[in-house]
Amino acid sequence: MFQKFDVIVVGAGHAGCEAARASALIGAKTLLITQNLNSIAQLSCNPAMGGVAKGQIVREIDALGGLSGIVTDQNTMQFRMLNRSKGPAMWSPRAQVDNITFGISWRKYLENVPNLQLWQDEVVDLIINSGAGEGVVTKIGLKIESKTVILTNGTFLNGKIHIGETNFE
């Protein structure tokens, strides 16, 4: 059904969206797999972008050409500068965004990226050859081959970390 991809990105949260877009924009034939195409870039716990720590990451992604900051700006409902009572080094912008339109905006951007395909399914296994990820097996039984696999599935591993074939819990 699928031809071989250069890159498969598993998970369409913020990291997966940025990774898939970056991969496709440099010319790699990329597949982004997510459990639900209607919850791309979902802000599960707190619909905010920014703050002291997350804000630094968003600014770094923005400097590297990512979309998180742009999509945030387009969907901001309220903006606030945090820590104004402290010195300027601690000031940090934070935007509260519309949780629904944020994901819709991300999906629209991704659907228009050349070399990028979106697929709704659950990855249940990795295809490993000589210690390298060379594809995935999905819940509906598809075996999709690629040159590399990027796992950005966040909390869906229940805190399990994979580094190569080594696992930590």
Residue ranges and their predicted role:
Residues 2-15:
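Beta1/beta-strand and adjacent pyrophosphate-binding region of the FAD-binding site
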Residues 3-5, 139-148:
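Core beta-strand elements of the Rossmann-like FAD/NAD(P) dinucleotide-binding domain
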Residues 6-8, 29-31, 116-117, 135, ...:
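Structural motif
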Residues 9, 20-23, 133:
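Conserved phosphate-binding elements of NTP-dependent enzyme cores
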Residues 12, 140, 153-154:
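Glycine-rich, N-terminal phosphate-binding loop of Rossmann-like dinucleotide-binding domains
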Residues 21-125, 129, 152-169:
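Conserved N-terminal/central alpha/beta ligand/cofactor-binding core
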Residues 127-142:
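Conserved beta-strand-loop-beta-strand element in the redox core of flavoprotein oxidoreductases
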